[in-house]
Amino acid sequence: SSLINKLSMEMKKLKLKPAVLAVDPTSHVTGGAILGDRVRMSESTDTGTYIRSIASRGATGAIAHSVRNSLRILEYAGFNPIIIESVGAGQTEVEISKIADITVVTFNPHTGDSIQTIKAGITEIGDIYLVNKSDLDGATQLFQALRDFIGTGEEEAVILKTSVKKNKGIKELASTLKELMKQKIKDKKSSEKSRVESELEDIILNNVRQEISTMIGKSKSFSSYLKKVQEKKMDPFEAADKLTKNFIK
């Protein structure tokens, strides 16, 4: 969030109108967003950047269902670019890459699983790979590891380093994003079909999930199968298979 704070300020210098959608963890007490991201971006708020915190609410990955609609509203309001900050790793970033035009995958030197994350395939989804907190020990080694794992593809990967503490690399990141935005606008027609397809699929799966959840709540057979599983008379996979067949008759 500190990085996005500085990045949004730099983008304003490039005559852009940034907005930030921060997908925050959900409070187990209130069900709302825990506004840690927004607190850390107070400097951007002071300079007029629109910042909206959205609770993840246990959605697939960490992307709330409202993100897409929020994007539409912000686009109509003339904000560009719209920065989506995720709350986690792995599946979260994959979900974001289906929504966003440009995906920036960020690594920190002191995150113990950074190299494992690189090996795990997260490097397949990014347009830019960023080593943040590059002033810390281990940043150079992490940067080189990224070059080794990512630089073997057909297209040359964009790998950058930033340091919010020393205010280094932020300007280069903002300029790189602006140039990528221009290129993505040219290529948008070819990518639009896959984005719409992904959105439609997500909506259908959400609808099915809600419908099944309602059926489970009303189902008498669910309690019966639950008891069988608890008493070890049936394994959960067999029970789930039978219940699913009942629900989709």
State each model region's role.
Residues 24, 85, 122, 132, ...:
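Residue-level signature of catalytic and energy-coupling elements of molecular machines
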